[in-house]
């Protein structure tokens, strides 16, 4: 059994040992997969097939031969995509990005504690506490993120259906049903309507067989399958049926030519799993932010390390200072804050029908600048619907809305009654059983898409089709075939005063018209003259130009004298007229746009997002839907439109004059990357029609070359490579295939394009709110770190301890920081351009300068003011404190004098110092009130925004209550060395809090009054 030419290109190559070779090979494989499908089995005659596969075309393989091939090729199943082991996922959460910074902090703390323990007799435990707490923070937030991701992957698992699929094969001349996984190359397989195709088949005989290829090629119409070789392209030819597509009607028999990963579907799945998803924008932002923070921390640490050596501290003390400064700079609570903010948004999106698989995808959607959307089922309803009728020489519009709230037409015309009768009788579609309580449009139908559309339309307009069919019982029928291009049936006519037999026919309009000599107008038969033929032609062109699928309908009342009751009609040797019929009308169908889509596309446009339609459907249909949903907006022309308007050949039009553009897949095949870039750059509204899955991938890569952040929507297997390659892949939850759901980052549970726009809005909002959260959290770093610096430089007793810093970062600041995630959008965020990931960072210099250089400095002043007030009240005036540190911290000196000559023992001094730590801590809480309120907005006044955020108000109360609890709770003096404060000491920082609020309101006022001015350039983060 020789291997065919096509086969060799499918064989997955062996994996090479060396890293570089491996990488080069992977790239080569990807390029190979991006090429179009190549196979030659569709060109072979039956004899050649028999020789190539050694299969008897009537008896099939022998069981023994099948077992040999199964052992050689392996089971007929797709290799599951490589999954990441759970422990690796967990480690990623524990050691990725921000966590790494905290781990380094923890290690440094243990190091400092080790140095102190080795050099001092009674070391302080601060650094030990700090190290333990930091480690705990990382582990807890790591577990939290891991749990969140595991939860969404559980939902993913539940999507997979566990029913093993069966296939009917012929072996040793006997039909047997086996597991589809056991099907081998060369097997003779039978399929019937409702079956899933078990492998790639070369059809050798068929009877009215149609398959639904939409998951593979994106065509919404069922495609006929027959033994005829009709097209060079294996995806277009009729004699190949593809693995995992569905047979919708008829029967067929075929030989298996490819199984498992070597099938066309298998190649696409391999293509998807071989693609590397890039880093998400938010991950890049957090990395950039860590670089900034680490940079600042190390710079400060090293500067003060050198400074303390110059100030003649011992190098051990200097190392302790270095570590202290670096740790004080790490915002311990931020990791948890970011995780919680993303989780909250993911939950909010799930309520709006967007299931996010990994948290970071939440924000990616917000920075999207291009959406490549599939047409069928995403932009459209994925159900063929009657859109227009042409009868009585005029076009009538049908109601295509999802809830039947649209237009209606005159249903009393005698011609309409005749037309609806033909559409109901000359129709094999039937409603499935037990659905009487469902609305008509929601009922499931057995039959092809066009006939289902006619059935539903007639049922809605004229009542029960079943009763109509019972009244006019069917006698004989000629089913639709590709040579005649019509379907005909003859029925008993129960109407009194009319002949006993009614012949009804439907089919391709031009073929039907050729068989007619008269036409029904207002219920009266008229001869079909040239004028009426022109009217027909115009109507046909108009409906076809709307991208609709048009069918013609005609009938004939068969005269009783020729066809008496009981006449034997013969469909093989036709003994009844099929010419000189009476033309009744046209009905056209379309898969109509979803109701919410035009509005969603409009929102995308005002948000600066380019929506590109990519579909396997016909260019005319694609263009019509694109116009219907606003992807091509009114007044925008394609090159062809301009040529038609100016009456010149297309070649004379400058392509850059056209805003819109419809690109055919076959043209895309021959384009260089530069030509594709040209199209993507110079046309604002683009439709790609008749595209293959590989081309979808090329389009996504083209958009990414332009620097766009690309979201791709799709439901078919054919979309999975593009879903994986895109910055964010969006799969359909209802119609989506398993492969596409695995490749995507987000799943639309209601399959509605409008949900994506909701997602974009949420993504932009979370980016804004994360900025605010970070600005709020970072500000308190300055009042936390300056006490340490002044302690080193001015040699004063330490104003704020390590434990109190932790109480701020992991205690009082947490809830307020998270509450900012609930803040509403301050301006219309869907009216601005998508952010540019190169320039518009989550944390930029302006944010750092605001948090550290301005607000943070005011906060530090507030803290020091409180510190000096308490020291002075206890007898130590500021000038007396300078240079006192060494004697102050010496536990053997018990007679340190204050400004009034009073002597203090070591224990007494420490109680004053720790009271100062507590007061400094409370002052930071007081100034953080103002900081939280000003962080609510970046441009608007707080008075415009209002205080509607209930969580934020709770946050203010929570941080105050926690501060009071830590200060006044009995036993805190022992546990955390925090002491009760006089009520007046709480008020020391109030003026500074007010100053922060006023300062920032004035700054925002100037920004609003002078947009683009110096203040905005320097301080708008």
Swiss-Prot record:
<keyword id="KW-0406">Ion transport</keyword>
<feature type="transmembrane region" description="Helical">
    <location>
        <begin position="287"/>
        <end position="306"/>
    </location>
</feature>
<comment type="subunit">
    <text>The sodium/potassium-transporting ATPase is composed of a catalytic alpha subunit, an auxiliary non-catalytic beta subunit and an additional regulatory subunit. Interacts with regulatory subunit FXYD1. Interacts with regulatory subunit FXYD3. Interacts with SIK1. Interacts with SLC35G1 and STIM1. Interacts with CLN3; this interaction regulates the sodium/potassium-transporting ATPase complex localization at the plasma membrane.</text>
</comment>
<feature type="region of interest" description="Mediates interaction with SCN7A">
    <location>
        <begin position="594"/>
        <end position="715"/>
    </location>
</feature>
<dbReference type="Pfam" id="PF00690">
    <property type="entry name" value="Cation_ATPase_N"/>
</dbReference>
<keyword id="KW-0915">Sodium</keyword>
<feature type="compositionally biased region" description="Basic and acidic residues">
    <location>
        <begin position="26"/>
        <end position="36"/>
    </location>
</feature>
<feature type="topological domain" description="Extracellular">
    <location>
        <begin position="791"/>
        <end position="800"/>
    </location>
</feature>
<feature type="region of interest" description="Phosphoinositide-3 kinase binding">
    <location>
        <begin position="80"/>
        <end position="82"/>
    </location>
</feature>
<dbReference type="GO" id="GO:0016323">
    <property type="term" value="C:basolateral plasma membrane"/>
</dbReference>
<feature type="topological domain" description="Cytoplasmic">
    <location>
        <begin position="937"/>
        <end position="949"/>
    </location>
</feature>
<dbReference type="GO" id="GO:0005524">
    <property type="term" value="F:ATP binding"/>
</dbReference>
<feature type="topological domain" description="Cytoplasmic">
    <location>
        <begin position="337"/>
        <end position="770"/>
    </location>
</feature>
<feature type="topological domain" description="Cytoplasmic">
    <location>
        <begin position="6"/>
        <end position="85"/>
    </location>
</feature>
<feature type="binding site">
    <location>
        <position position="715"/>
    </location>
    <ligand>
        <name>Mg(2+)</name>
    </ligand>
</feature>
<feature type="modified residue" description="Phosphotyrosine">
    <location>
        <position position="258"/>
    </location>
</feature>
<dbReference type="GO" id="GO:1902600">
    <property type="term" value="P:proton transmembrane transport"/>
</dbReference>
<feature type="topological domain" description="Cytoplasmic">
    <location>
        <begin position="1005"/>
        <end position="1021"/>
    </location>
</feature>
<feature type="modified residue" description="Phosphoserine">
    <location>
        <position position="45"/>
    </location>
</feature>
<dbReference type="GO" id="GO:0002028">
    <property type="term" value="P:regulation of sodium ion transport"/>
</dbReference>
<feature type="transmembrane region" description="Helical">
    <location>
        <begin position="950"/>
        <end position="968"/>
    </location>
</feature>
<dbReference type="InterPro" id="IPR023298">
    <property type="entry name" value="ATPase_P-typ_TM_dom_sf"/>
</dbReference>
<dbReference type="GO" id="GO:0042470">
    <property type="term" value="C:melanosome"/>
</dbReference>
<protein>
    <recommendedName>
        <fullName>Sodium/potassium-transporting ATPase subunit alpha-1</fullName>
        <ecNumber>7.2.2.13</ecNumber>
    </recommendedName>
</protein>
<feature type="transmembrane region" description="Helical">
    <location>
        <begin position="842"/>
        <end position="864"/>
    </location>
</feature>
<feature type="topological domain" description="Extracellular">
    <location>
        <begin position="307"/>
        <end position="318"/>
    </location>
</feature>
<dbReference type="GO" id="GO:0030007">
    <property type="term" value="P:intracellular potassium ion homeostasis"/>
</dbReference>
<feature type="region of interest" description="Disordered">
    <location>
        <begin position="1"/>
        <end position="36"/>
    </location>
</feature>
<feature type="modified residue" description="Phosphotyrosine">
    <location>
        <position position="10"/>
    </location>
</feature>
<feature type="transmembrane region" description="Helical">
    <location>
        <begin position="319"/>
        <end position="336"/>
    </location>
</feature>
<dbReference type="InterPro" id="IPR004014">
    <property type="entry name" value="ATPase_P-typ_cation-transptr_N"/>
</dbReference>
<dbReference type="GO" id="GO:1990573">
    <property type="term" value="P:potassium ion import across plasma membrane"/>
</dbReference>
<dbReference type="InterPro" id="IPR005775">
    <property type="entry name" value="P-type_ATPase_IIC"/>
</dbReference>
<feature type="topological domain" description="Extracellular">
    <location>
        <begin position="865"/>
        <end position="916"/>
    </location>
</feature>
<feature type="modified residue" description="Phosphoserine">
    <location>
        <position position="226"/>
    </location>
</feature>
<dbReference type="InterPro" id="IPR023299">
    <property type="entry name" value="ATPase_P-typ_cyto_dom_N"/>
</dbReference>
<dbReference type="GO" id="GO:0005391">
    <property type="term" value="F:P-type sodium:potassium-exchanging transporter activity"/>
</dbReference>
<feature type="modified residue" description="Phosphotyrosine">
    <location>
        <position position="540"/>
    </location>
</feature>
<feature type="transmembrane region" description="Helical">
    <location>
        <begin position="801"/>
        <end position="821"/>
    </location>
</feature>
<feature type="topological domain" description="Extracellular">
    <location>
        <begin position="969"/>
        <end position="983"/>
    </location>
</feature>
<dbReference type="Pfam" id="PF00122">
    <property type="entry name" value="E1-E2_ATPase"/>
</dbReference>
<keyword id="KW-1003">Cell membrane</keyword>
